[in-house]
């Protein structure tokens, strides 16, 4: 890789899950990639639990296997989940998904975000076609028919065929590209933390739809669970400020003590929930992936998986174009990626919006309808299997990396 002129094939701004996944795939295919990350390199020591976790589905697992990082991630702290149980506070509705019913070993894995990103960064540092630049932020970009010139806040300049914005929900690349954004707050915030429960979670994920918002318990190692409690902003702030013993009591009651008493609770954090989707995924020699393009409500745990599939899809499109000796930073190539992913991501956003409003209503008639819907889905095997395939990520038009396990 030419390290004197900083002339590369692709510049990736942002090295979170989506950006690092894309960079690994491109570098493995022989494209020279410069990765610009505003923060420090992610560190994993295994001592403290990361409050941010992801429910990695089977499609995302396949992507991580294809990159050769899954075995290393497995050596860190991960927890498979074999069952998903969902029930509704306002009705008798309940649905239960089991890996065994679908002939699968697991439905997915709960993994701390730092365990994934740290492993991907370790992989990138081993790639001869990848170069990491920490503590840099993109401040300017200017494109022509041949290339895009990217300037950072420290004056470092990169010349490339393509700039990828993987720099999160507040994307600077998106702003520089002039790409419009549709966004609206959910008027909810999520409280995240870890708890230890009296009873074992039995490798199951649980979600209860409360009138105030969904509450999820996601299995971690031992009898520890990650919690994501979404509530209106006032209630979320109240929950955040409660002493631990009062919070444990409120949480246990909200969860109907499904796993017995909550014996301890970690430090908690709160973050706002916002629906975002860009008007377009591409500009002139610029393309967006992951949270830079879309953010969703966490009630289905799909955000990280969407970003990983974005990355795998864009990698497939770019590598195919490069192999055909076409302009992989040109509009024809980039529009192919946009057509592939925009509709799928919009479907997820619309579905989650619908669920958010459906389960957020306290109207008795709507509560009865959703209870009937949950129970009906639980009893109709083909319908239940359709939802299960959706949950595992194995439906829809997937890139090759997401389709097949390569263990």
Outline where the language-model segments fall:
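Conserved N-terminal helical subregion
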Residues: 5-7, 71, 77-176, 183-189
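Glycine-rich FAD pyrophosphate-binding loop
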Residues: 27-49
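FAD/FMN-dependent oxidoreductases across multiple families
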Residues: 237-332
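N-terminal Rossmann-like FAD-binding beta1-loop-alpha1 element of flavoenzymes
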Residues: 9-35
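Conserved FAD-binding catalytic core of PHBH/FMO-like flavoproteins
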Residues: 64, 147-149, 157, 162-268, ...
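C-terminal helical "tail/cap" subdomain of flavin- and related membrane-associated enzymes
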Residues: 316-407
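N-terminal glycine-rich dinucleotide-binding loop that anchors FAD/FMN and/or NAD(P) in oxidoreductases
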Residues: 50-74
């Amino acid at each position: 890789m030419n390290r004197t002129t900083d002339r590369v094939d692709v510049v990736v701004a942002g090295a979170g899950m989506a950006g690092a996944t894309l960079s690994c795939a491109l570098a493995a295919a022989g494209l020279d990639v410069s990765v610009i990350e505003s923060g420090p390199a992610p560190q994993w020591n295994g001592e403290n639990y990361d409050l941010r976790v992801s429910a990695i589905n089977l499609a995302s697992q396949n992507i991580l296997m294809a990159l050769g990082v899954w075995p290393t991630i497995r050596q860190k702290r991960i927890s498979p989940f074999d069952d998903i149980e969902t029930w509704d506070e306002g009705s008798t509705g309940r649905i239960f998904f089991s890996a065994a019913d679908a002939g699968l070993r697991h439905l997915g894995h709960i993994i701390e975000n730092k365990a994934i990103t740290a492993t991907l960064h370790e992989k990138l540092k081993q790639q001869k076609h990848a170069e990491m630049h920490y503590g840099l932020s993109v401040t300017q970009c200017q494109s022509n028919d041949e290339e895009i010139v990217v300037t950072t806040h420290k004056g470092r300049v990169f010349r490339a065929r393509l700039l990828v914005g993987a720099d999160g929900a507040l994307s600077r690349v998106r702003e520089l590209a002039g790409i419009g954004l549709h966004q609206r707050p959910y008027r909810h915030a999520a409280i995240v933390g870890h708890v230890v429960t009296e009873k074992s979670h039995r490798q199951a994920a649980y979600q209860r739809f409360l009138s105030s918002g969904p509450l999820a318990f996601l299995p971690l190692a031992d009898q520890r669970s990650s919690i994501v409690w979404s509530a209106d902003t006032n209630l979320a702030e109240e929950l955040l400020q409660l002493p631990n013993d009062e919070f444990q009591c409120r949480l246990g009651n909200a969860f109907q003590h499904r796993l017995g008493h909550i014996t301890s609770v970690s430090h908690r954090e709160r973050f706002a929930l916002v629906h975002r989707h860009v008007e377009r995924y591409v500009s002139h020699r610029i393309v967006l992936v992951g949270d830079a393009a879309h953010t969703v409500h966490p009630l289905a745990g799909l955000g990280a998986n969407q970003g990983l599939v974005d990355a795998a899809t864009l990698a497939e499109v770019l590598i195919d174009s490069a192999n055909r000796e076409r302009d992989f930073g040109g509009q024809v190539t980039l529009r192919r990626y946009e057509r592939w992913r925009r509709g799928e991501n919009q479907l997820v956003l619309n579905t989650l919006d619908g669920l958010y409003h459906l389960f957020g209503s306290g109207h008795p008639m709507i509560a009865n309808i959703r209870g009937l819907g949950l129970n009906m889905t639980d009893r109709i095997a083909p319908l239940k299997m359709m939802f299960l395939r959706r949950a595992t990520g194995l439906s829809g038009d997937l890139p090759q990396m997401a389709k097949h396990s390569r263990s």
